[in-house]
Every structure is written in C-alpha cells, then in structure tokens.
Amino acid sequence: MLATSNRFERRKRRVRLKLKNNLSLLRLSIFKSNRHFYVQLIDDSCGKTYAAASTLEREVIALAHRRVNSNSVKIVAKLMSERLNKLDNCKKFVFDRGPYKYIGVVAEFANELRSYGFEF
C-alpha cells in the first residue's frame, strides 16, 4: 500500500511540475474517488475557482444513480461545458489529471469536454 501511495504522489508531483510552466492558462483539475468525480477550473495566479461540477449535483444523481462511470462523467462534462461557456474567453486551459492515469473515466471526461470545443 505504501508503494502505491508513493507512486501516486510522484505522478502527481510530476504532472504539476509540467503544469507550472503554463501559469498564464487556467487549470482544470479533477479528483475522483470510488463514488464521485469532481472537476474545478482554477486560476493559480490568484487562487480563485471559477467553475466546478461533480457527481454530487442533482442533475447527475438523478441520471447516474451515484456511480462513477462513463455515463456520469459525460453528464459532468456537459454541466462543466455549460458553466465554462458562461465565462468569457475560457476555451483554452491546462488539464490537470493529478495522480490519475489518462485512461477510463479520466480520458472519457477529457474527450467529452474536447467534443464541446475546448482545447487543452
């Protein structure tokens, strides 16, 4: 268990170090657990969160039945795209996957958000 957590921490640090080069762009950060999926758009220069969406919202709970799968992640991506469209000039940002590999629901979320016209 200790080796797994160390791998997660190393991967998280490695990803964040690469993202620090793009401080001019906003950061789209994700967190996933066994039951929920969270997304935030963060401005690291001032420490402000502009938009957030998760599987804890009523629209997602009604359709996804409290599971983190491709259907619930697609709904979260749709909610996030609606909230990002309300912001001005927010079509390009950096995708912070944290300690998670780019497979499964992480890749599904990223591809779904790209299909709505966002670049990262």
Curated annotation (Swiss-Prot):
Keywords: Ribonucleoprotein, Ribosomal protein, RNA-binding, rRNA-binding. InterPro entries: Ribosomal_uL18_bac-type, Ribosomal_uL18_bac/euk. Disulfide bonds: none annotated. The keyword rRNA-binding applies. CDD domains: Ribosomal_L18_L5e. One of its GO terms (cellular component) is cytosolic large ribosomal subunit. Signal peptide: none annotated. GO terms for molecular function: 5S rRNA binding; structural constituent of ribosome. One of its GO terms (biological process) is translation. Part of the 50S ribosomal subunit; part of the 5S rRNA/L5/L18/L25 subcomplex. Contacts the 5S and 23S rRNAs. Belongs to the universal ribosomal protein uL18 family. This is one of the proteins that bind and probably mediate the attachment of the 5S RNA into the large ribosomal subunit, where it forms part of the central protuberance. This is Large ribosomal subunit protein uL18. The gene is rplR.
